[in-house]
Amino acid sequence: YKRQDLPFEKSSNPYISKGLNFNFKYFFLRKFMFAYRSEALIIMPGGFGTLDELFEVLTLIQTQKIKRDFPIVIFGEHFWNELMNTDVLKEYGVISDNDLDHLFVTDSVTDAFKHITERLQ
């Protein structure tokens, strides 16, 4: 899905298929379609918007608003391991191991593809 028009981003990702390049005026609508229409999610290193979208989907899975198997590949191990210390979240009791079952952190395109295709079978 196309990013929201932001003043500091001048163009869409050139790798998005034209048929999948949508414009959204409102963030909430983009996130709804993002969660509703996607079968899997690949998250690349990013800023607050990327984190917002990731945590939105994780919250929907945790609260069972998304009940289907929804694999999430988090690409870029160093970036995400520095950013998210899930062990601390587990220690505080705010997430469980089950909450992390949908996450797959990797640097390998091959492993990411394998993970998604196995989960969606």
PLM segments and residue spans:
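C-terminal binding/interaction regions
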Residues: 28-33, 37-43, 61, 68, ...
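C-terminal functional extensions of proteins
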Residues: 74-121
